[in-house]
Amino acid sequence: MKLVLLLGIGVVAVVGVGSTVLLKSNAPREVTIVNGSNGLGSLKVDNVEFLQNGDFRLDDILLRKPNGETYPGSTSGTALFDQGRRELSVTYPWGEVHVGYAVAGNKLTLTIRTVNSSESDTIQGVRYTPLALKFPDKVKEYDGSIPLLAHNIGQVAVVKLSYGSGSMVIAAEDVEKPLMVGLPWAFNKPTNTEFPLSVHTDRVSSYPDSYPTIVRPIAPKSSDEFVVSLRFGRANATEASLAGDVDKKFTTVFPSTLNWTDRRPIGAIFLATDPQGWSNNPRGWFNDANLNITTPAGHAQFRQHLLALADASIGVMRNMNAQGAITWDIEGQEFRHATTYIGDPRIVDTTAPEMADVADEYFARFRNAGFRTGVCVRPQLLKLSADKKTANQMPVDDPTQLLIDKIAYAKKRWGVTLIYVDSNVNEMDHNALDPSIIQKVSAAFPDCLLIPEHSTLRYYAYSAPFFELRHGVTTTPESTRDVYPKAFSLIYTADGPLDLYKEGLKAAVKRGDILLYRTWYPDPQNEKVKAIFKQ
């Protein structure tokens, strides 16, 4: 026997199994709370208790003097809970914290306002544990080691969790100001059902070094407000169904401006190899140990080889129905990693003088054949040693302007429109640069396609991020397309298991992703790439 009854807005399925009757509801979760003296006394979801500890706790606070010296602030304060307003106020020697608790349907919202009462010192960072959670079942996503944390630097700060009978999302409601939220560890490993909720700015020494610094200082005699929500759902709830409003808020604040309709494949060209110690061919041109660029005859041979490579590449591109090609190393590869790719077309004539009188003709061959051209640029500045035998890529104060200057040069001289942005990371934590940099560069060159090596969600609003098939990436993440439906990526197929991922790549191409392939010679893999586009 099987029947379905409609009760209000929920759907209750009554399933008969022998003499046992099971009720399964798809109605939204219902959150209820009870006030405590130092926070919450209870947090229930459909009458199931989820609160392990409801006391609000300040774990760390770091203040900075005008001279730059930092010191820890006091974490001991005097608490007062306003039962009517459901607001906790805690007074500290350096200021105050006010925490509001609000419930609506399946959501608990915490509003944390930090007041800096100091006349001179800035609050550099804070770390709060507003409460601790107790799940009915083991949290599936926690592996016992990696924190379940998210930040909103260039992305939404949303952590999706599942625990057997249900799911939950932790979200930072503000999509513009940086914040990190989530569950850093379990209290009861390996059971993994009890976790502190963490909200912080600046850095936490016990967290992985790869996490970004959350720069959100609170100036003297001012305040700041963090708004964090816990959203509860059924076991089959998706991140989009629980936090779609946060995604919508994100795209409203950071709308997509990318307009690139050509999704045909793009060819990759590498003219050189990394340093091999060849004194007569120090930049590794054509992986040829016998090439001697120090003589007039060697220069002539270099020119002939380069233009022949261009012609051969064009033949491959026609066969592949490519839209264009990116030359990664027009300056050669004289220096070791991580300076292998110079990424500065402005200095090609001086760093690779043998290229000076042939580079223009090289790129012209592609343009005259009807193909787009491209180069690699970096947001750092190359600094040569005094003897010019070594070099480093140095960060600059204004990477936006540096990228604009490099691209403008290559665009004016060679007509490039395909721009690979190499090593676009912060100096300290090696996370992707602020996406506003890519936004400004994209606005300066609306007819160019930017392809950044590293990316966050917001990068997709202005560019096509780079991925490699050999690392198991076959397409733009669905979570990204939930936010930016027209988002697409550039996926480098070389040395990747094309047969294994063929169906995934077919689906990716249908959705608009672009495949990058080797075009400076007829790579046997190219026919497999070509076949993907002929589905």
Sequence positions of predicted segments:
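Conserved, mostly hydrophobic/aromatic
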Residues: I112, K221, F366, D422, ...
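Glycan-recognition surfaces
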Residues: K383-D405, A432, A444-Q535
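Positively charged n-region of N-terminal signal peptides that target proteins for export
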Residues: M1-V4
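Active-site-adjacent beta->alpha loops and helix N-cap segments on the catalytic face
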Residues: H430-I438
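Aromatic-lined carbohydrate-binding/catalytic grooves of carbohydrate-active enzymes
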Residues: A268-M428
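Carbohydrate-recognition beta-sandwich/jelly-roll modules
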Residues: L23-F335, D349, I532
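Bacterial Sec-dependent signal peptides at the C-terminal "C-region" and cleavage site
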Residues: L7-A27
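Alpha-helix-loop-beta-strand connector modules within alpha/beta enzyme cores
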Residues: Y362-F366, I437-L449
